[in-house]
């Protein structure tokens, strides 16, 4: 056979492939079954979120954050609210902080449950997704009972949360926390020692720690490579400094280590949720769930019926919104997928001048070519599952 007669084979992976996690299109260059090059094509879910936010008041911008990583919506609202609160220079009441942390941990479990079980499905196990979705359904009901909506909650507010949690809901969350570790143990027994699952994940998609820093990884992708970098510990925000929890880290930086980390993080999240519930019931956990300043937080309905001033505040807030002092601020939270950051620039008006969103999935997807090169075609879906990419936040 003459030189140069061998030609690499190019195939499209997605955007309608079941393992592509939404609307990802990968153009793969294959030499036989070995991946030579991966070219991710993004933008199929682009909605211009950052531009839309510039035309909305600060209150109207909150729902856009639910639609980024729509697997764990409240974690993103959290970053935006913290950024706006930093510009306004306000402190959130303690009860509101506890409720926020409680729901952020629920979001973390929602995300990790989906990721671990679909990663198992990508390599051929069909039972875990069914168990995972059963638990996610219960958590979405908690979202619904707090905010009225299962997914796009829009529950966090600048200055606190929308409304208090009923005592019965807190009890139900506690009951769920007692039962859930058993589900994690069941998944553990099914997958962790499973020969086929290990063959598909061990030593696949290895990322060393220096490489993880170079590519701008965060979250599980960095911790899987051996760095105990968790913003809840290294730069505590809200009341995370009071919480007692461990940051699990991996040794090998492969898909299997990242799976083990997500399993352990679910256990840690349950522990944080239990601590939040205990603190919410304590005497110092009682009190308002939002700021009492009616220039920022709307007054209660009952107050509006009695006081003309409250009615005027309400009208001004919902027509014009509140003005935020000019300045710029970057706030990052430890979202389930990694470091979710909001860079907010205010020009002193009632709308953000610029809101730049730093999505963790974007940095992870750009390294897809680097991580996948030299692996087999079958490993692409395992690596993709382990990067934990959601397209709402990548394309935004």
UniProtKB/Swiss-Prot annotation:
Protein name per its UniProtKB record: NADH-quinone oxidoreductase subunit D
EC number per UniProt: 7.1.1.-
The UniProt record lists the keyword Cytoplasm: no
Gene Ontology cellular-component terms listed: plasma membrane
Major subcellular location class: membrane
Protein purpose: NDH-1 shuttles electrons from NADH, via FMN and iron-sulfur (Fe-S) centers, to quinones in the respiratory chain. The immediate electron acceptor for the enzyme in this species is believed to be ubiquinone. Couples the redox reaction to proton translocation (for every two electrons transferred, four hydrogen ions are translocated across the cytoplasmic membrane), and thus conserves the redox energy in a proton gradient.
Gene: nuoD
Single GO term (MF): quinone binding
């Amino acid at each position: 056979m003459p030189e140069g007669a061998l030609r690499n084979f190019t195939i499209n992976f997605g955007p309608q492939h079941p393992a592509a996690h939404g609307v990802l299109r990968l153009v793969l260059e294959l030499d036989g079954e070995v991946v030579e090059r991966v070219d991710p094509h993004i933008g199929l879910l682009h909605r211009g979120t950052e531009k839309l936010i510039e035309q909305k008041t600060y209150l109207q911008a909150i729902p856009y954050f639910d639609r980024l990583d729509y697997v764990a919506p409240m974690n993103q609202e959290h970053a935006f609210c913290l950024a706006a609160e930093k510009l306004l220079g306000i402190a959130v009441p303690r009860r509101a902080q506890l409720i926020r942390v409680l729901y952020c941990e629920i979001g973390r479990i929602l995300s990790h449950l989906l990721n671990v079980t679909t990663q198992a499905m990508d390599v051929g196990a069909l039972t875990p997704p069914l168990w995972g979705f059963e638990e996610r359904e219960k958590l979405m009901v908690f979202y619904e009972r707090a905010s009225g909506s299962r997914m796009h909650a829009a529950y966090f507010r600048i200055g606190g949360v929308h409304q208090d949690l009923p005592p019965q809901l807190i009890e139900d969350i506690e009951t769920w926390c007692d039962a859930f570790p058993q589900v994690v143990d069941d998944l553990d027994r099914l997958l962790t020692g499973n020969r086929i699952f290990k063959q598909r994940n061990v030593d696949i998609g290895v990322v060393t720690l220096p490489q993880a820093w170079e590519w701008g990884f965060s979250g599980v992708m960095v911790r899987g490579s051996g760095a105990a970098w968790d913003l809840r510990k290294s730069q505590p925000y809200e009341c995370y400094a009071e919480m007692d929890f461990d940051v699990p880290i991996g040794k090998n930086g492969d898909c299997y280590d990242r799976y083990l980390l997500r399993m352990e993080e679910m256990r840690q999240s349950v522990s944080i949720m239990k601590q939040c519930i205990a603190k919410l019931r304590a005497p110092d956990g009682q009190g308002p769930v939002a700021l009492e300043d009616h220039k920022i937080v709307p007054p209660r309905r009952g107050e509006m019926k009695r006081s003309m001033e409250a009615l005027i505040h309400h009208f001004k807030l919902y027509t014009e919104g509140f003005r935020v002092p000019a300045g710029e601020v970057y706030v990052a939270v430890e979202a389930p997928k990694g470091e979710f950051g909001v860079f907010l620039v205010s020009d002193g008006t009632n709308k953000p001048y610029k809101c730049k969103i730093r999505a963790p999935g974007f940095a992870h997807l750009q390294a897809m070519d680097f991580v996948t090169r030299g692996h087999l075609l079958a490993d692409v879906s395992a690596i993709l599952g382990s990067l934990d990419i959601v397209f709402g936040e990548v394309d935004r």
